[in-house]
Amino acid sequence: NCKGEKIAERKPAISFRVYWDGDLQDEILNGTNLSKWNGTEALTINKFPGAMHCNGTKRTPNLSADLFGDWREEIIFSDTEDPSKLRIYTTTIPTQNRLYTLMHDPVYRLGIAWQNVGYNQPPHLGFYIGDGTEDIPWPQLYMPHGQYSKE
């Protein structure tokens, strides 16, 4: 904790972080297993059968990104039977949290690029979202033929 006191006996294995289940905390993606840390243990949310991770011991997805635009991220793996095919996984868990697509954040967009051209690490935001977040910064967009609003 902030006082330097140990808060748990164990810690989860973490390869990637992913926004998946609809709360404002990220989940843990380790290989093809997605889990949620509850402070004591990692609880499995989803396993992706037929999916193949890459990068040997790091066991990363091909890409994780907010591709479809509701702010939660999709995960892309190769197919175990035919690695020339891709599998795109998206969440079906409902959420009450409404945010704009993460791709509107320039730091996040840069993170998607670095996954593809360099060291395969998960993307991060240029602002904080997590438990207790109430005010998400509104993206600075330029609309050449119109205006936009939060509504």
Region spans (language model):
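Beta-propeller-forming repeat regions
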Residues: 1-151
